[in-house]
A protein has these predicted regions:
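Glycine-rich phosphate/diphosphate-binding loop of Rossmann-like nucleotide-binding domains
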Residues: 1-10, 120-196
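Acidic/polar, glycine-rich intrinsically disordered N-terminal extensions of enzymes
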Residues: 1-18, 38, 44-45
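Short, small-residue-enriched loops and turns at beta-alpha junctions
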Residues: 26, 56, 165-169, 201
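N-terminal glycine-rich phosphate/adenylate-binding segment common to multiple enzyme folds
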Residues: 28-121, 126-129
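Short glycine/threonine-rich loop-to-helix capping motif typified by GTGT followed
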Residues: 30, 168-177, 203-211
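Glycine-rich phosphate-binding loop
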Residues: 39-57, 181, 187-213
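Short coil/turn connectors at secondary-structure junctions
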Residues: 11-15, 44-45, 75-77, 94-98, ...
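N-terminal beta-loop-helix "entrance" segment that forms/cooperates
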Residues: 10-36, 200-202
Length: 213
């Protein structure tokens, strides 16, 4: 809160801060990690910032402690993370300026699988299974966000990351939708890369990337 208030003061912006319980505090005060009162208040605010809510004190086997993804309640599908190097901060690579986008309402954490809860289940003590969901709608709209952001940047480049060669149906669907969206943005360069490959390139030379989805 000290940092947030200092940032607001620096801009001259007047902000009314409303602290709300969530996570461990929410459960201790209201009996659930995402209290209804908190959700209602969030719906009535202009914006909000969520601090760290994970805690090792949550009982492992108590399902009431599972945090219902608040991004699902508000359809916050795009996790946008800019990464940038600064001249006055020592770093291995100079001139790094990347925006990463990740779809966070689908995949392994979709909470919309045919299994209740997180989509994980254990048929016996030797096997655990996790399912994931990839949809055309979800793939298209995260790709669309990536291209919209790229269009506002100097390099105007989007790199789609997937593992289509192995996961032909799920990653394949994501890749297909990225290509369709790319055809609608003739002014933005588009390329694709294998997830294993980009892991190496980000270490060796991250400056070659602009917007990564």
């Amino acid at each position: 809160m000290k940092v947030l208030k200092a940032a607001a003061a620096h801009t001259g912006l007047h902000v009314d801060w409303i602290p709300l319980p969530i996570g461990k505090e929410g459960h201790e005060k209201h009996g659930k990690t995402t209290p209804d009162e908190t959700v209602q208040e969030l719906q009535n605010t202009d914006g909000w910032i969520m601090g760290p809510i994970g805690h090792r004190a949550y009982p492992r086997n108590d399902p009431t402690w599972i945090m219902p993804p608040i991004r699902k309640l508000f359809d916050l599908f795009a996790n946008v993370k800019p990464v940038k190097s600064y001249e006055n901060i020592p770093s291995i690579h100079k001139n790094v300026d990347i925006v990463f986008l990740r779809e966070v309402t689908e995949g392994m954490q979709s909470w919309d699988t045919n299994i209740s809860g997180s989509g994980e289940f254990r048929p016996n003590d030797e096997i655990s299974i996790g399912s994931r969901i990839i949809t055309r709608k979800g793939s298209r709209r995260i790709a669309m966000e990536a291209f919209k952001i790229a269009r506002t940047r100097q390099r105007k480049q989007v790199t789609a990351v997937h593992k289509e060669a192995v996961y032909r149906l799920t990653c394949g669907m994501f890749a297909e939708e990225c290509r369709k969206v790319a055809s609608e943005f003739s002014d933005v360069e588009f390329n694709e890369i294998h997830i294993d490959t980009i892991a190496a390139h980000l270490v060796m030379d991250p400056t070659k990337f602009d917007v990564v989805v």
